[in-house]
Amino acid sequence: MNKLISFFILVTFSYSSCETTKNIFGNKAKETTVEELNTKVLEKTIIYKTFSGKANIDITGPNISQSVNAQIDILKDSVIGISLRVLGIEGARVMITPDSIKILDRLNQQYIPRSFSFIETNFSLPITFSDLENLICGNPVFYNNTTLSQGISDDKYVLFAQKDVYKNTIWLSADLDILRMFIEDLMNKRTLTLTYDEFDKIEGRQFAFLRTILIDATDDFTANIAFSKITFNQPFEFTFNVNPKYERID
């Protein structure tokens, strides 16, 4: 369960709904400048105060083949709360803040507090709390508005951007919805591929409901995640109470 939790924290954030309809992109990409495309990408950024959603997640990798259900709640810039269930029973609860990650492993009756640097230490990935929020909402990650170049391929816009040692190739539909991101770690020779499908509008926001995550590194992982019952800007309740009988793992 601990290995599953660690992997889930890293790649948990993609969506699908059993009630959505697939968006067929009818428009064609038109010639534009890098500056115009950057501006349009920023205009498509999802703005919110709270997010809530349920997910069905299938994860495969070395020594992992697991399906879980998850409830994910976000209070923007403050906390990400995650409840993981297997066969209807909560196996773990995770609370992430900008400076900490706290895990309740109910199956092993353990409390595992960590600093936010746990992610970088274990995965050599300098991801921020804001990056995690962007992953959940489908906003660009490892993208600091510094686009090296852009082009058009098969009626899709292609952006080439770089942030530190991370090179990000982003494919956009003619409607400027993110279809795929291919992130290369130029120093450690690792890649992260995010694909997006099943677009629909949720409360006026164009949203990719089906995503696949591929990590190509020392260990290779795949995650297929199906999200449903998504809401924005609605109150939610997320509790994180540590049972005094749980073993603390420092």
Question: Language model features by range: what are they?
Answer:
Residues 58-60, 87-89, 201:
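Hydrophobic lipid-interacting interfaces of membrane-associated proteins
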Residues 71-72, 91-93, 169-171, 198:
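Short, surface-exposed charged micro-motifs
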Residues 49-57, 66-74, 78-84, 92-94, ...:
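One face of beta-strands
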Residues 20, 149-250:
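Gly/Pro-enriched, hydrophobic low-complexity segments
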Residues 80-130:
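An acidic-aromatic
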Residues 18-66, 248-250:
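N-terminal leader/targeting segments and the immediate start of mature chains
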Residues 1-18:
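Sec-dependent bacterial lipoprotein signal peptides
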Residues 122-151:
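C-terminal low-complexity, charged extensions that often adopt amphipathic alpha-helices
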